[in-house]
């Protein structure tokens, strides 16, 4: 009974955590603290953010939106604009609330979409409890459904599709982004990506690095690879700079 109440009505408790600089993180779902801990406590992205002005952000695999909120709270002097792309139905409430957060003054846009092959209108997405969802099922118990494939024309805030920073954490679908949305990459200055060895390109990190090098990117910093949680394989984090980007 208690577990059911916590699952269905967790958002009614209005849990919030102060971040500094008058920003707050709201925890609307019962597993939100896991994501909050990764971003705000472990600060897994801290060493992978370039020391440059970052105003226009594309947040792919936004989950509960904490990366964009973390970056804004770290840089209160900048008015950051973020497009948060997340296919999960479980994250809808949190991302809608964040997009409406008054202190952000409508600078965060939320798109419920999957980074798949844009030749197809919809992409199948798998939910996984207490971890990020994925385009790839990891067990027979994963719940799946169809989600609209990301359409670049819906990014109304940035018609030129150029970003200072693209953050990409797609649980294996990063290869889809690199292949099918290369125009966004080529017009963006920095890329911070969590890579996964099971991405559909089949060649692990080296294949990703080779393709990015072909596009004109240089890896500036890379973490050690580690065993993935929840499935076989490895993952890691890196920062890359577009050497062809015109300021």
Predicted features and spans:
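Phosphate/nucleotide-binding beta-alpha loop and adjacent structural elements of enzyme active sites
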Residues: 1-247
